[in-house]
Amino acid sequence: MTSNQQRVVVKVGSSSLTSLHGEISSKKLEKLVEQIVRLKDEGHEVLLVSSGAVAAGYRKLGFINRPDTLPEKQASASVGQGLLIEAYSKLFLSHGYIASQILITKSDFSDEKRYNNVRNTMNVLLKRGIIPIINENDTVTVNRLKFGDNDTLSAKVAGLIDADLLTILSDIDGLYDANPRKTPDAALVQEVTEITPEIEASAGDAGSEVGTGGMKSKLDAFKITMASGIKGFLGRADTPGILHEAICGTARGTYFIPNADSHALNHKKQWIAFNSGPEGDIVVHNESKEFIIDRKKSLYPSSIYDINGRFSNGSVVRILDQEGEEIGLGVVNFSSSQLRKWKKDTNQETAASSQAVVDREAFVCHLELSVPL
């Protein structure tokens, strides 16, 4: 790609793809594809994160209304995902582009090897001119192992592939200083450089009845992209030419701009911070916090006050102070059993004192993030 060409993740929610009756609207699908095709014709790489599997499938199972129970939703998604990707593929092919399908579960991201494998696959597809279409594998995913919604998934995918821009298309114009559905004179916020508690409180939870992601989930998604050094945009899906304008910086909506002075998290730290899932805790002496946070030092055995849980070498653990306040997350070089042996045996601890328990390169401090760990 040239300097003017960008790698863009486009996320579209169910509410932006469905009719008033809750079914997939072929007209809305066609308009979305036409906008993505324009980006492709301009030389951009585009990855689409698309909801809509349940909406595409539930009528085929004989349901009059969108189902409420998990088995019914998963059955609807099983039928709908095939129909949705078929519709996308035909539309893109009519413009000369090939689409691919990638169904992801949270466990694909929590395992580092699979996480890296997903990235490699996506990079090959994008470099070969393919349009990957991503969705969570709703048919096999249970609630406790879900991303939560496709807003979160799209943000993590954007970081995974080093995207230049994440564009979330919805049924609202952007972020307002109050909920526009409840406050008629609410003003559109054009640019956000920090997502503060005040912004979150004023946003409320404006969302649609069709999708699962309200404004809170979108703000959480943009916290992830901002920590990863990626620009974000939130705008209305039915605005003509909005994807092109979003790249040009002229679209009506809200831009989320990462801090140019802060260091963006690399892939390793993104995985640790947003995907890994801690398996235990290491409690450090309070006087060690300065070395870990301010002086950015690795964590050594002499700093350990206590160890909670059972974990193996290579696991991700939480680093806590003596009051239980979380300092960050890190990958440990030693198992919990080995660390406990060192704690009991002063001679062994002394012999191991030069070996880092958590290397600085494998540690993410909460101060590095604009999103809670």
Curated annotation (Swiss-Prot):
It is an enzyme of class 2 (transferase). ATP binds at residues 11, 170-171, 212-218. It catalyses: L-glutamate + ATP = L-glutamyl 5-phosphate + ADP. The keyword Protein transport does not apply. Transmembrane segments: none annotated. Substrate binds at residues 51, 138, 150. SUPFAM superfamilies: Carbamate kinase-like, PUA domain-like. One of its GO terms (molecular function) is RNA binding. It is found in: Cytoplasm. Residues 279-355 form the PUA domain. Pathway: Amino-acid biosynthesis; L-proline biosynthesis; L-glutamate 5-semialdehyde from L-glutamate: step 1/2. The keyword Transferase applies. Belongs to the glutamate 5-kinase family. This is Glutamate 5-kinase 2. It comes from Bacillus licheniformis (strain ATCC 14580 / DSM 13 / JCM 2505 / CCUG 7422 / NBRC 12200 / NCIMB 9375 / NCTC 10341 / NRRL NRS-1264 / Gibson 46). The gene is proB2.
